[in-house]
Amino acid sequence: MRAVDIHKSYSQGVGELEILRGVSLDIREGEAFAILGASGAGKSTLLQIMGTLDRPNKGELYCEGRDLLAMSDDELSRFRNSEMGFVFQFHHLLSEFNALENVMIPCRVGGESIKVAKEKALHLLEFMGLADRRDHHPNQLSGGELQRVAIARALVRHPKILFADEPTGNLDSHTSGKIQELFFRLKEEMKLALVIVTHDLTFATRFPKVYRMKDGQWQS
């Protein structure tokens, strides 16, 4: 995947609030790296654009030779659901569904049968050590369990890229460490590209490559 000269700004009164200022980035197959920066640096906005959750004001975005910015919103939604997974600081699980049903959602949105979706979801919950929590609703799960369910949901369609935005930011230090270990295990076993956005220097420096962002630009 490649982002070229990405600019993003928002109207603010009589002026513009510039968030990203000509950022370029390549994501290679199976690569893992962290994007490190303080709050407001622009790192989450970049992740949202790379993940096609938002569009830039200017720039180019390609994946496997396809011009993602030329796609319609419906085309992008289908592409995103099949090729990308997302984990956020907050789990965003649906309270009316149990853990198994939450993990099944991307498969059902993608048109897969209930049988196939259930098989995939059960396999991932077992991998996450949550097979015995499959029937529990979000209000019956701990913070670490909620995040592991969210990670399973992000992986259920076997994406090529996993984007994670402050995935340990809402967890205590012990649980955070366990989730960090899980990400590295997933990267190796599932052979996916992993992009982590964080302000946690300790977490970031565990990656072989770290990009530092400040004021919407890369720091040299």
From Swiss-Prot:
The keyword Cell division does not apply. The keyword DNA repair does not apply. It is an enzyme of class 7 (translocase). It is a peripheral membrane protein. Its EC number is 7.6.2.-. GO terms for molecular function: ATP binding; ATP hydrolysis activity; transmembrane transporter activity. It holds the Pfam family ABC_tran. Residues 1-220 form the ABC transporter domain. It is found in: Cell inner membrane. ATP binds at residues 37-44. GO terms for cellular component: plasma membrane. Keywords: ATP-binding, Cell inner membrane, Cell membrane, Membrane, Nucleotide-binding, Translocase, Transport. PANTHER family: ABC TRANSPORTER ABCH.1 (PTHR24220:SF86), IMPORT ATP-BINDING PROTEIN (PTHR24220). The complex is composed of two ATP-binding proteins (LolD) and two transmembrane proteins (LolC and LolE). Belongs to the ABC transporter superfamily. Lipoprotein translocase (TC 3.A.1.125) family. Part of the ABC transporter complex LolCDE involved in the translocation of mature outer membrane-directed lipoproteins, from the inner membrane to the periplasmic chaperone, LolA. Responsible for the formation of the LolA-lipoprotein complex in an ATP-dependent manner. This is Lipoprotein-releasing system ATP-binding protein LolD. It comes from Bdellovibrio bacteriovorus (strain ATCC 15356 / DSM 50701 / NCIMB 9529 / HD100). The lineage of its organism: Bacteria, Pseudomonadati, Bdellovibrionota, Bdellovibrionia, Bdellovibrionales.
